[in-house]
């Protein structure tokens, strides 16, 4: 009987700490003072870890220094992806901000460095060097 990767990993109990970019890639967009960041799993077996750990609260804490007023997460399970809409994070938006990155395009990179705990059994599905 085949055990799904997440169930096998949970049974082993071992975890490794890795940044989010080892599990997923991301893309940022903007509209006014709102940023949206898409997070897409590199492999379907990593989806459950993303749903469990890349939450609205985790994202809000990650962007705490930018003082977002609201973070919403939208799950796209058939695509093994999620989209975050983060309000009031661009210092007024493109026309009002003095930031070098007024579109917030680098925000995905900030999120992709989020540390996660991944079951060791899922290590073969992680991107990049160990």
Question: What residues fall within each predicted segment?
Answer:
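Long, contiguous binding/interaction regions
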Residues: 2-130
């Amino acid at each position: 009987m085949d055990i799904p990767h997440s169930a096998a990993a949970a049974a082993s109990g071992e975890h490794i700490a890795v940044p989010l970019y080892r599990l997923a890639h991301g893309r940022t967009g903007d509209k006014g003072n709102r940023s949206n960041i898409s997070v897409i799993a590199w492999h379907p077996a990593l989806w459950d870890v993303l749903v469990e750990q890349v939450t609205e609260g985790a994202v809000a804490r990650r962007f705490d220094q930018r003082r977002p007023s609201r973070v919403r997460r939208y799950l796209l399970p058939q695509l093994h992806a999620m989209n975050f809409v983060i309000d009031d994070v661009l210092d007024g938006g493109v026309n009002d901000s003095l930031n070098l990155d007024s579109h917030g395009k680098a925000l995905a990179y900030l999120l992709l460095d989020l540390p996660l705990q991944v079951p060791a059994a899922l290590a073969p599905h992680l991107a990049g060097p160990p």
